């Protein structure tokens, strides 16, 4: 899969590696796309619906005057513990090196070394070939 800039949520999540985006039946279109089918928890996401986010130039949380907010801290902690990925690190890469660098970084770490399929951030194995990571 080729990751695109629109796939990166304001919090730094790469929607292209989300299990909701990757599923075959009723895949989520991604955080930045306002259409169904989108899970209810995504529709009501505090971050994507944040008024302060709309005031940023880039559309990313790292430009917000309240960065990092309590919601982003909580989300980052949960993803670091459960999925070994940090939204703060993702946003830092975007801010310091640009979107192209981040997308190349994501492609490298989200590609199965066994079969080349896209890896989900939410699973410790490849959804295509089953190799444990």
Range-by-range predicted roles:
Residues 12-15, 25-28, 42, 47, ...:
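Disulfide-stabilized extracellular ectodomain repeats and their linkers
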Residues 68-71, 86-95, 99-111:
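Extended, acidic-biased charged interface segments
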Residues 2-9, 13-30, 77-78, 82-93:
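Ferredoxin-type iron-sulfur electron-transfer modules and their immediate structural context
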Residues 2-9, 18-22, 33-39, 52-55, ...:
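Short, flexible, mixed-charge glycine/proline-rich loop motifs
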Residues 51-89:
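Mid-chain, well-packed structural core segment of small domains
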Residues 26-27, 38-42, 72-73, 120-125:
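Short Cys/His-rich "knuckle" micro-motifs
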Residues 19, 32, 46-49, 54, ...:
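Cys/His-coordinated zinc-binding microdomains
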Residues 28, 61, 112-115, 126-129:
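Short cysteine-rich clusters marking metal-coordination/redox-active sites
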């Amino acid at each position: 899969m080729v990751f695109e800039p629109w796939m990166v949520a304001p919090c730094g999540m790469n929607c292209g590696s989300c299990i909701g985006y990757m599923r075959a039946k009723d895949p989520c279109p991604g955080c930045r796309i306002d259409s169904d089918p989108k899970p209810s928890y995504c529709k009501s996401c505090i971050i994507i619906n944040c008024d302060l986010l709309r005031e940023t130039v880039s559309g990313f949380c790292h430009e917000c005057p309240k960065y990092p907010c309590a919601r982003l801290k909580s989300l980052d902690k949960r993803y670091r513990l459960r999925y070994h990925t940090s939204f703060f690190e993702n946003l830092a890469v975007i801010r310091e090196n640009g979107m192209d660098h981040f997308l190349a970084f994501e492609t490298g770490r989200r590609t199965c070394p066994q079969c080349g399929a896209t890896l989900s951030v939410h699973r410790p194995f490849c959804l295509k070939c089953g190799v444990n990571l």
